[in-house]
């Protein structure tokens, strides 16, 4: 497992800037088989593997040559790109992002972790992601691009960042005389609980509940400006039911996230 990085070093000329620390949930993606192309793919790693929410299978380039992923977004608002489970953390490898063929994220290295690039809102017709300098053919399991859901209330205290919510299933071995020999890790994931209070009735119903109802995996950043590395690719586990907290209709809700980081 590894940490995640949010890129906040980009300010676009159009749209509304992020205030900074509202939690971001990237759950809707514009990238589909109908509007996405890539320079190359393999029989075992087709483009379609990257365009669903399973982290078990990859898109894989057929060579180490420069690869360009092109998504025709048709003028729909975009403010984030999410990449989960990949091999892009290679020496010399860079990615570049362009909106309508204008560079918005200059060539930059990628670290070995879930990546969420948060941007100012824009409405490009075409988004391109160029991968150059690979020493090993590029692989990506999940690619999302779209408009992130920004939480109405910031999270301040009582929250476990997903990167620190380690859940480990392991077997510890001991000798007959009680000496520690070693351990076998059977499974390792991340988890956290999200608790939101005093949500306005309209915001909950119009903005948050569609995500709760969809129950699809998402990119999650709890406090993007202060803790940019604390991001995961997560899904809801168990019940997620809102309650009416006040006579004015204010709502509250808690749910558990399970995921990878």
Question: Which residues does each PLM region occupy?
Answer:
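Extracellular/virion structural assembly segments
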Residues: 1-67, 74-92, 106-124, 130-261
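Short, surface-exposed beta-strand/strand-loop-strand elements in extracellular ectodomains
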Residues: 90-101
């Amino acid at each position: 497992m590894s940490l995640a990085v949010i890129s906040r070093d980009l300010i676009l000329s159009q749209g509304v800037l992020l205030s900074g620390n509202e939690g971001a949930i990237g759950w809707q993606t514009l990238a589909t088989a109908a509007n996405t192309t890539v320079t190359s793919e393999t029989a075992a790693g087709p483009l379609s593997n990257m365009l669903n929410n399973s982290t078990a299978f990859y898109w894989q380039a057929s060579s180490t040559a420069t690869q360009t992923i092109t998504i025709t977004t048709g003028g729909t608002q975009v403010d984030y790109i999410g990449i989960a489970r990949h091999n892009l953390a290679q020496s010399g490898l860079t990615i570049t992002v362009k909106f309508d063929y204008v560079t918005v994220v200059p060539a930059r290295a990628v670290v070995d972790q879930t990546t969420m690039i948060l941007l100012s809102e824009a409405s490009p017709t075409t988004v391109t992601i160029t991968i150059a300098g690979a020493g090993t053919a590029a692989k990506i399991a999940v690619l999302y691009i779209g408009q992130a859901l920004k939480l109405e209330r910031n999270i301040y205290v009582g929250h476990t960042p997903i990167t620190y919510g380690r859940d480990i299933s392991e077997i510890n071995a001991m000798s007959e005389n009680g000496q520690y020999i070693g351990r076998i890790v059977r499974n390792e994931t991340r988890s956290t609980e999200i608790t939101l209070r005093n949500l306005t009735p309209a915001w909950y119903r119009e903005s948050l509940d569609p995500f709760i109802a969809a129950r699809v995996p998402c990119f999650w950043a709890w406090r993007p400006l202060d803790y940019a590395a604390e991001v995961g690719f997560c899904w809801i586990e168990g019940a997620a039911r809102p309650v009416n907290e006040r006579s004015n209709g204010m709502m509250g809700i808690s749910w558990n996230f399970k995921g990878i980081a």
